[in-house]
Amino acid sequence: MLNFYKGKRVFVTGHTGFKGSWLCKILANAGAQVTGYSLNPPTNPNLFEIANIEGDIKSVIGDIRDFDLLKKSFDEAQPEIVLHLAAQPIVRDSYKMPAYTYETNVMGTVNILECVRQSDCVKSFLNVTTDKVYENKEWQWGYRENEPLDGFDPYSNSKSCSELVTHSYKNSFFADGRVAISTARAGNVIGGGDFANDRIIPDCVRALEKGEDIIVRNPHSTRPYQHVLEPLFAYLMIAKAQYEDIKFADYYNVGPDECDCVTTGELVDLFVKYADGKINWINKSEKNDVHEANFLKLDCSKLKSVFGWTPHWHVTEAVEKTVEWSRCYMEKGDVRKCMDKQIEEFLASRI
């Protein structure tokens, strides 16, 4: 699959983030001509700078809400493929900054789709959203792509809106098939290089660095955790397939098998195990905390039936690879080499 991307012009929004940095590394390794458009890296430290991703691509620092700069950068790049990852991605932050969250996640989607609409170079567009776009009914079954879109909190709801914007543009402006448009609704991702606040694995890594207990807010919440490489390669698979044949342009869930949908407490137990048991975790549930879903799974039958896709790593391996990368970073090792190694191992594996 990666041979397809050699020489392809790819425009990635949100390239300085955790997922964006991994994605740009994969594309650069494949020989793609990558232009990234994003705000400055969202954390300090951050994977984008640690792994010197800027040296692999053309990086433009800009706000997805700034249409003029976005359009200028887009027109200069003349992309064939657009992968839209730029977002305000933290649920808890969306309660603090609801207007900013909607501006970024909804109008940001409008802006990038306007760039696509006003161009004649793009053949494939993929909007990356989230498993949280669905109306959460707190049931045990995985949500399918035809379930109602109605995220509860400002982050989740803004991503539901982003889906609807994409659907509208697809129907209104691209019904002639000149651009293949899809969305990908991915489950929770983990992996080396995530330094975000209010995410459980980065919290674990920080606790390991400091030799402190891990604070867990919602140990009984179930999430579709997967290694970051799982959805990234799914995105690239979808973008390639619809580039070659528009019949693949659709809406897809991307998540782990049901056996790998674990509680946050079980995930932290795995982290402690692969960290050689050198840390512990404590439950500090907050009764008056902001609303977050307790039970969330995805049904990924569609992705499997259409593409023959299956996950490469179980959640145990995903956590093990995360700890491996984190140790490399903490011991001041070569994190770029570690990323390349894990990408190669991922491509060589299949559950």
Where are the predicted features?
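N-terminal Rossmann-like NAD(P)+-binding domain of SDR-like oxidoreductases, especially those catalyzing
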Residues: 1-186, 329, 346
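Generic structural signal for small/hydrophobic residues in well-ordered secondary structure
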Residues: 5, 15-17, 82, 169, ...
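C-terminal substrate-binding subdomain of Rossmann-fold SDR/epimerase-dehydratase oxidoreductases
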Residues: 28-30, 62, 208-351
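Flexible, glycine-rich phosphate/dinucleotide-binding loops
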Residues: 43-44, 134, 190, 260, ...
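Residues in well-ordered alpha-helical elements
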Residues: 67-68, 80, 92, 99, ...
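Active-site phosphate/pyrophosphate- and oxyanion-stabilizing loops and adjacent acidic/basic residues
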Residues: 71, 114, 202, 269, ...
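NAD(P)-dependent short-chain dehydrogenase/reductase
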Residues: 137-142, 146, 154-155, 160-243, ...
